[in-house]
Amino acid sequence: MRKLSVFYEHILQACEQSGKTIPEVLAFCREQGISAVEMNYSLFASEREVIAPMLSDAGLVISCMHETFDFSHDTDLGRAQQMLDTAASQQVSRVLFVAGALETAEAAELAACSSTYEATSTFMAENKSIQNMVHALSSLAEYAALRGVSITLEDFDGFLQPFARTYPLLWFMEHVPGLRYTLDIGNFAFSDEDVSYAAWLLKDYIVHVHCKDRAESPLVHGRFCRGLGQTPAGTGYLPMAKLLTDLEACDYDGYLAIEHFDCLLYTSPSPRDRQKSR
């Protein structure tokens, strides 16, 4: 049985789009077979006394907490440790860190060499910002493990982030003990990389999945990228059904997070109906 989650930000968007209250949209999600939400840590920390009871009343849990940090430059890990403590207190076993960014020139150099693992590894080992991230993530992974939490990176859709492409991600997984991977199906298109190959190469590290799809554009003719437009999960050009089947064949039993920012929740097929049709 697939476990479905949805981003809490989508819940808030659906309220704006439909005029319904947050509890009403949460109840709708539960009726559609969704059992959890993806939660931004800062939002939860600022509204915990409101959000936690609403989720409990709806029969929903938090599948993963996510937050942006600057481990490439900031050595203070206090806020990240607070996030891990909060996740543990809510029985959240996965957190996603957007862990930092490079300067534009550094990012361009990494992009130029990221087609091979050997060149990628040389760059990553010599870059100070990336080494700062490694030290921070290593410390936090150890801190998290003591609390029953796994920290993850995703294939981020940004040029400056050194975890946007396949080989840099593999390098991080191999150099940070305990680090795990959140597969975002839609984000390799940003770097014009093959999501199927990436999922295969990184399969042993995958503990969480974002089901983000992409809409085709007649103006985009990349090798793997045919557009970056938003579209409800399962309706775009990415091989989502096959990827999910392959994950299940590898005994993946984690959450599948529905991610489709700016797509109308109430005018799209339900997650349950979409699963039946694929």
Q: Residues of each region from the PLM?
A:
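N-terminal pre-domain/capping segments
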Residues: 1-94, 128, 180, 278
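Acidic-and-aromatic substrate-binding clefts and catalytic sites of carbohydrate-active enzymes
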Residues: 13-17, 38-50, 69-77, 103, ...
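Conserved, mostly hydrophobic/aromatic
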Residues: 29, 55, 87, 151, ...
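A structural motif
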Residues: 34, 92, 206, 252-253
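Acidic/histidine-rich catalytic cores of soluble enzymes
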Residues: 37, 139-237
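Active-site acidic/histidine proton-transfer and metal-coordination neighborhood
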Residues: 57, 61, 72-181
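Conserved small/polar residues in nucleotide/adenosyl-binding loops
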Residues: 266-275
